[in-house]
Amino acid sequence: MFKCPERVSIKKKEDILDLPNLVEVQIKSYKQFLQIGKLAEERENIGLEEVFREIFPIKSYNEATILEYLSYNLGVPKYSPEECIRRGITYSVTLKVRFRLTDETGIKEEEVYMGTIPIMTDKGTFIINGAERVVVSQVHRSPGINFEQEKHSKGNVLFSFRIIPYRGSWLEAVFDINDLIYIHIDRKKRRRKILAMTFIRALGYSTDADIIEEFFSVEERSLRLEKDFVALVGKVLADNVVDADSSLVYGKAGEKLSTAMLKRILDAGVQSLKIAVGADENHPIIKMLTKDPTDSYEAALKDFYRRLRPGEPATLVNARSTIMRLFFDAKRYNLGRVGRYKLNKKLGFPLDDETLSQVTLRKEDVIGALKYLIRLRMGDEKTSIDDIDHLANRRVRSVGELIQNHCRSGLARMEKIVRERMNLFDFSSDTLTPGKIISAKGLVSVLKDFFSRSQLSQFMDQTNPVAELTHKRRLSALGPGGLNRERAGFEVRDVHASHYGRICPIETPEGPNIGLITSLSSFAKINEFGFIETPYRVVRDGIVTDEIEYMTADVEEECVIAQASAELDEYNMFKTPVCWARYKGEAFEADTSTVTHMDVSPKQLVSVVTGLIPFLEHDDANRALMGSNMQRQAVPLLKTEAAIVGTGLEGRAAKDSGAIIVAQEDGVVEYVDSYEIVVAKKNNPTLKDRYQLKKFLRSNSGTCINQTPLCSVGDVVTHGDVLADGPATDKGELALGKNVLVAFMPWYGYNFEDAIIISERLIKQDAYTSIYIEEFELTARDTKLGKEEITRDIPNVSEEVLANLGEDGIVRIGAEVKPGDILVGKITPKSETELAPEERLLRAIFGEKAADVKDASLTVPPGTEGVVMDVKVFSRKDRLSKSDDELVEEAVHLKDLQKEYKSQLAQLKVEHREKLGALLLNEKAPAAIIHRRSADILVQEGAIFDQETIELLERESLVDLLMAPCDMYDVLKDILSSYETAVQRLEVNYKTEAEHIKEGDADLDHGVIRQVKVYVASKRKLQVGDKMAGRHGNKGVVSKIVPEADMPFLANGETVQMILNPLGVPSRMNLGQVLETHLGYAAKTAGIYVKTPVFEGFPESRIWDMMIEQGLPEDGKSYLFDGKTGERFDSKVVVGYIYMLKLSHLIADKIHARSIGPYSLVTQQPLGGKAQMGGQRFGEMEVWALEAYGVAHMLQEILTVKSDDVSGRTRIYESIVKGENLLRSGTPESFNVLIKEMQGLGLDVRPMVVDA
């Protein structure tokens, strides 16, 4: 069996932990959302299940009718992902929900169709209307509590906290300049502030004594001794002191005890007092008690309502319901598990499951938060303010959660409709069922809207496998509920210490989105709360163990973490007593005895794409950023070639991107061709795994997706082996560019300003040739004037033009086409208004003629040349207009299909029986297996499974079997569920194919008779103007293609393939490219491939050793000879191999010229841009240039007849036709526009003729 080439490395020990599945972020999240493969009763309260449980039951206003949710059921996709792309439809499954309706007539259960729901492909993408899309994960501010501080204009530091729910009103508490705390509800309504004491009372703490008891510890103090009396002066009362007989109040709770007051209390015969420990008159709580205008629960509620809703009558009922709605109603206010977890953690409340399930606000939360705020104000060392840019306070909303939120809003809309229908339903005339009151429109429209319009649902970047992979791992701070690009400051965009191992500090776009769109680091995972975790090795008693612990940013703060490069001895103990470590985001030299954890790998800091840059540690960060971004723009080449100098991540990136085909199970290759690989399974050779290869498909970016087999018949394969290469891969490794022999030297000035000189040899060898595929589509519709027709019979078109069209009017596959050629001939009925008067007269005299149609053919647009590589035709079949022959042919096809279906079903049954037999035969049943519906015991506990029992189980459905939880039941469940899914899928495929034979493409849009898609492939060779780049941010444009004979050559006669400017290195500080040049040269000469992983690559000394071993110059420089003259250049030049990429900015797509084209409606000036077939704007500065040369006639021509002089344009055309070289310019249309605008302002502006 073919194996990937082994790369040479100087790394002594491999990483302790393998990279996780790189698209797990997407797949895991959506799996949890839908919980596919789980029985209804096994589903957890998450995702779609959670949304249904939240919204239901729905009750009518009089509570006589109740609609309850029972379970949902997902169907099987009708078409495969490839077929959905081909047909331009959405890859989805049907959603059916079982409801129970209870009303006065009884209980009814019904399964209701709720539309379709898009499902994710194995690669982590969605197919929406035939286009692959990715839902980008969003980073947003975590729900919970944040403590902040800001400086007042007077210099005081004011502390505040903010309780942010997942859904609902924000609650803010802010200290003012007088040390009083005010509450703000919702930031938008900040003007309406409420004193915190009033709010506390409104929560139910009515008396001052209750409040003091909450905030202070209360002590009962005796008044018997004189020393007690003296000690109590200046203390604060914790309760009212009241005379029991006369109800006379001697002192109120919160009052400061004076000597006079104490005497009065003593005289009244009071023996002891309740004192608030630690309280004084300057304490914020005591200050607020004196300032509070209310003194009871009722008064506080009314005051709260008045401030929240000024102008409305403040009744107790209204006030109570408002505060309940705001913070204590789960439908309107929800902290979520995350918010509750963060709040409890900060305030020191328990973190058990029961507590975390409380999603609304509690009184204790407000009191706890106020206590913490006061401690913060008092300078308590155990309290701290929160950094909002820290990853402990920012979480990730992945695809599942984003769609869940949209489903919630869709079902909430449905809830209102259901309630209205319940109340308006006429029970006397009809029976109410769930299907009659449920409308699925709300849910369907919300999902459709999200996938097609949301800022986070993006058209997948499919330029190459790396671009695809990065897009799925992208994190965005933009989007609904996120930040705004214009308002985001520097702090949010900046690299934070907590990003280490979680978010890549390098990979981010240049421009306005810098720092807002980022990428997950290579080892990072997202936990159940949405926080990003990174793995560390646990260190115990100075010994680095192999135990791995995933930690969030807040947990990491308390750990001392050593670098992965710290040297260890054979016992996994640190070699030195001191090593570099991190603690609370700061790097320092730590005593190894204090180290608690160690990095898993040096590359855990960076993302996958950044990890593909060799010698990253020698590059400036700005250039590394460009290098990361430009790898995503590399075009897959016709002849792929893996990099000589790699980093070791190439194989994994190719595998997880889904570009290559990997063996799912061990086995032997039984059959291989260009379209399919068949592997017989090792355990059971009768069972086969079939792998379909993708052949010359068009990607989203127009590049070519083509897979080629790497294995041969008889090869023994193991799980994970590469079976076929894909686009931009070579023997299972990523191959984005070519290894090129490069010289760093100036050459006749052609590599000025980063320009690149290339040898013609690269063109001859097709080194940088790539294939582009363009799709052209044409539809024939049934219009009001009649049916459009796809035909070869097109009016006023010569036979030469139609040479490549078949009898049906569609271009033949293999035809070479150029701009203007017809791809599909189409005629459309003409309307009366489109006919000239003489045509109408002839029609009236001679009746209808065939010429009453116009040519609406699909032609090749400008700038496109190539070969027609595929044609797809979709059409509906009319049952009534089928001929007898067609009906006979249809019956034959259906019979063949049924035969194939039965044979596949029989094969499935055999496989199922064998799987059951392998698991159960002669085994003892650990528990009884009961039939769920009939309650019959199918297998007794302890019974031995024989062939008869296995055949009995084989006929049963998983839904009908009940067994006590055990290992055997779990395996049995997996076997039964996978069998049921396979049978269901086979059945759906059979029905779909049968439907297609009978009715054609029934899923075409309404009114479409026929749809034709033509794919034109063009071969693009490297040419002057194309952009190229290395992996270190060293980019440039091809300036000259030099004949091989003229290129500089080495002493051995070998010509250099590319020349780069040496001035591109020192100022850019990307020395990685120089080290890559030297190592590449040494490795190429030795005939090996090397890997130099990030931060643990080849040291300089090792590279020099390799060069000396291969007999190359020690300094890496060689004398070159001029190909033109044969003379030696004066100085030595750095020569070596660099991996260079061709980027998707091809000159062929950018170059553009206009002779004639469209004009703007108002100004009558030519439009701009290639897409509009626009002209080149001759602006103000260009006018100055021509004025400076005094070319008046040329200038006049450019500003009038070549632009917006309408009459002049017509005249100049006539004069050119007649052969007259005469320019008579008129008035430019823009002048007329100016006149009209001035007239619009009421200024009477008219050109006047004045006699000379």
Swiss-Prot record:
InterPro entries: DNA-dir_RNA_pol_bsu_ext_1_sf, DNA-dir_RNA_pol_bsu_external_1, DNA-dir_RNA_pol_su2, DNA-dir_RNAP_su2_dom, DNA-dir_RNAP_su2_hyb_sf, RNA_pol_bsu_bac, RNA_pol_bsu_CS, RNA_pol_bsu_protrusion
Statement: the UniProt record of this protein carries the keyword Magnesium: no
EC numbers: 2.7.7.6
Keyword Glycosyltransferase: no
TM segment ranges: none
Catalysed reactions, semicolon-separated: RNA(n) + a ribonucleoside 5'-triphosphate = RNA(n+1) + diphosphate
Keyword terms of this UniProt record: DNA-directed RNA polymerase, Nucleotidyltransferase, Transcription, Transferase
Family from the record: Belongs to the RNA polymerase beta chain family.
PANTHER family the UniProt entry points to: DNA-DIRECTED RNA POLYMERASE I SUBUNIT 2
Assembly, per entry: The RNAP catalytic core consists of 2 alpha, 1 beta, 1 beta' and 1 omega subunit. When a sigma factor is associated with the core the holoenzyme is formed, which can initiate transcription.
Classification via NCBIfam families: PRK00405.1 (NF001616), rpoB (TIGR02013)
Entries under HAMAP family matching the protein: RNApol_bact_RpoB
Protein name as it appears in the record: DNA-directed RNA polymerase subunit beta
Source species: Chlamydia trachomatis serovar A (strain ATCC VR-571B / DSM 19440 / HAR-13)
High-level lineage: Bacteria, Pseudomonadati, Chlamydiota, Chlamydiia, Chlamydiales
